[in-house]
């Protein structure tokens, strides 16, 4: 009954939940750090009807249900301790939802806890994500796949791995990449009427490709379409 009551209360208000993978327990209600839950799964269950779910993760490793966390029409904010100490294992799918993540590492490289051959993060049908001071570890496909009029904003985030692209944007979507680090080989691709902004990138400087009708801005300047991968530092080259 207490769990049912908690879910009912969450349907009418913003709900804040604390989770601690090391010292928490799912028998608690998660309302304070001292009463922290142990799993992200229970935190998502208790906040499933909240208009806004705010989840604080203590340092530790967390897994998502069935390897993929799917958010449908939800508003979820997840705050970690630091990206170096707070790891979320699995893949994320956001559909018509808003997801904010700060100071968290998303890792989809282990087949026991994730689907390594899939996109690490997928945004579809007007979804939105904001990632600040995060790390994304990807084994296959794209680190972030953005489609169907969705939008993404990355600040101070490092993207690693990816057999295809760090950020793949299509379907009238847009992505803003600020002071991020690219540790992939192909960087960004803009297609399908999308718009991409890259500012103050480091690492491989987010090499990009874009189709003829897509718009890419690098450090505030619009660049010409590039069908082969180039670094943003070469944007003024005629070739």
Segments (PLM) and residue ranges:
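Glycine-rich, low-complexity segments
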Residues: 1-20, 219, 223-239
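Right-handed parallel beta-helix/beta-solenoid
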Residues: 3-42, 61
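N-terminal, post-signal-peptide segments of secreted/periplasmic proteins
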Residues: 41-56, 61-74, 84
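All-beta strand scaffolds that present successive hydrophobic residues in beta-strands
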Residues: 57, 77-80, 99-103, 128-132, ...
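Right-handed parallel beta-helix/beta-spiral solenoid domain characteristic of secreted/periplasmic
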Residues: 65, 74-122, 132-139
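Residues in short coils/turns that link rungs of repeat/solenoid architectures in beta-rich domains
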Residues: 85, 108, 138, 143, ...
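Fold-core signature of tandem repeat domains
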Residues: 121, 129-131, 144, 167, ...
């Amino acid at each position: 009954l207490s769990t049912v009551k908690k879910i009912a209360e969450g349907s009418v208000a913003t709900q804040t939940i604390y989770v601690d993978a090391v010292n928490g327990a799912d028998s608690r209600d998660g309302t304070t750090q001292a009463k922290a839950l142990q799993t992200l799964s229970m935190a998502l269950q208790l906040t499933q009807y909240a208009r806004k779910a705010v989840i604080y993760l203590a340092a530790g490793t967390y897994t998502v249900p069935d390897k993929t966390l799917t958010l449908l029409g939800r508003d979820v904010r997840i705050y970690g301790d630091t990206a170096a100490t707070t790891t979320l294992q699995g893949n994320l799918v956001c559909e018509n939802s808003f997801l904010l993540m700060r100071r968290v590492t998303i890792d989809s490289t282990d087949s026991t806890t994730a689907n390594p051959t899939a996109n690490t993060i997928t945004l579809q049908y007007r979804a939105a994500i904001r990632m600040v001071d995060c790390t994304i570890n990807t084994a296959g496909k794209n680190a972030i796949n953005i489609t169907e009029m969705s939008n993404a904003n990355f600040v101070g985030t490092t993207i690693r791995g990816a057999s295809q692209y760090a950020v793949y944007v299509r379907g009238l979507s847009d992505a803003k990449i600020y002071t991020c680090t690219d540790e992939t080989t192909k960087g960004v691709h803009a297609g399908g009427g999308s718009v991409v902004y890259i500012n103050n990138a480091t690492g491989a400087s987010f090499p990009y490709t874009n189709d003829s009708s897509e718009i890419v801005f690098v450090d505030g300047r619009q660049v010409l379409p590039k069908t082969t991968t180039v670094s943003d530092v070469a944007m003024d080259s005629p070739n």
